[in-house]
Amino acid sequence: MTALEDRVYDVVISGASIAGSAAAILLARRGVRVALLERRSDPAAHKVLCTHYLQPCSYPVLEELGLIPALEAAGAVRNEARWYTRWGWIEPKAAPSGPELPYSYNIRRSTLDPLIRSHAAKTPGVDLLTGHSVTGLLQEAGRTVGARVSGPDGEVELRARLVVGADGKDSPVARFAGIETRTYDNERFSYFAHFRNLPLRDGITHSWFLEPDVAYAMPNDDGVTVVAVIPGKDRLPAFRANLEGAYTEFVRALPGGPDIDAAERITKITGTLNYPLHSRRPGAPGVALIGDAALTGDPLWGVGCGWALQSAQWLAEATATAATGRGDLDQALTAYIRRHRRGLGGHQHLAVDYAKGRPFNPFERLMFSAAARDEAMARHMHLFASRLIGPLRFLNPVALAQASVVNLRHRGPRAAPPAHLPRPTPATTATGPAPHPRTATLPATSQNERLTP
């Protein structure tokens, strides 16, 4: 076999999870020679802290990748959803005689990551190099022309027209390229646990918007459901004092929530106390960023996996020809940057604002209340929540007028905030709730631990 330093590549991709593997497949199918680097050697390596939710915006990418049959064979669950609000449940349904609602899948990363990585490894034109990581970039005349790569046999230099950072929210490639990171505080924290055989009405995803707290229960493959609580940080002292008890109390208090006492909890309670949102310019001369490396959303919305797949597809469409030397790479990267910003910038802007830990604003109250009262508005909400339409289309004048008409038809006393646990007061933040006698005894993570992949 040719020594690694003597191999010729058009593109070097750092990171072989969802974004990196998808980009490698899509680029190679367009004639690009790809080195796909993964720092971990374990073929089963996967991201731990994740919603495991593929938004419907990801379905066209999964279809192009040819992964739909493999996902369904692996037990992926089609992700229908309903959302609880102070006005009742939003339950999107297909229009009479209309097409079914767009969907994608819920599937655990322990299943998805090895599946898509294996698919990439079998794709002609892709060299999957596990146990290898980028330790620096090669630069000439102000542009990146390759990467320094560390592996089991030492460090080598790989020259390439394009280096792609698919290496997560703390992206070393972005740091080596000097790409600025914009960081936005998140005034909520989150904890997750996985349950087997958890009863859920209709077996579909449930989300609770409790203003400002949020929670969700998402069924996945192999009969496993992830239950997440995402409270405002004023509840943090109670979780620090007694994670097990606070998590359990929070879930039990959810209106129409899952009966976790009737299920088997199969994991520890894991999560993060501080998960800021990040945005970066997704390209520089000779460098592109995809997935969380370009934009880290709020886990509250479950958008990371879908955006990873979309950004991989946009990159391949924009740069494949230029990456093989048959076009202007700078122009191609500019086209990718514009597509990325046009597709995700508006969604991220709204997510940054909602991450302030606030209740719904007037526009959100208008649209959520109308969606809870009207099937057509619920379908409109579904398209937006699926990231199939952007904020401008979601809040277009016609939609706002329709929502107003719906709400005028349901005039009555102003809806109170959602009933849940009372907000903490200074007298109650020092101690947490007592554990319920039926609470499982599996250990929980340290309350100060932030898990990383």
Please identify what each model-predicted range represents.
Residues 237-331:
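FAD/FMN-dependent oxidoreductases across multiple families
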Residues 63-114:
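A conserved beta-strand/loop capping segment in the N-terminal third of enzymes
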Residues 14, 28-50:
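Glycine-rich FAD pyrophosphate-binding loop
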Residues 4-19:
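Beta1/beta-strand and adjacent pyrophosphate-binding region of the FAD-binding site
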Residues 320-453:
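C-terminal helical "tail/cap" subdomain of flavin- and related membrane-associated enzymes
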Residues 15-20, 168, 291:
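Conserved phosphate-binding and hydrolysis motifs of nucleotide-dependent enzymes
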Residues 119-256:
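Predominantly flavin-linked oxidoreductase catalytic cores and closely associated redox partners
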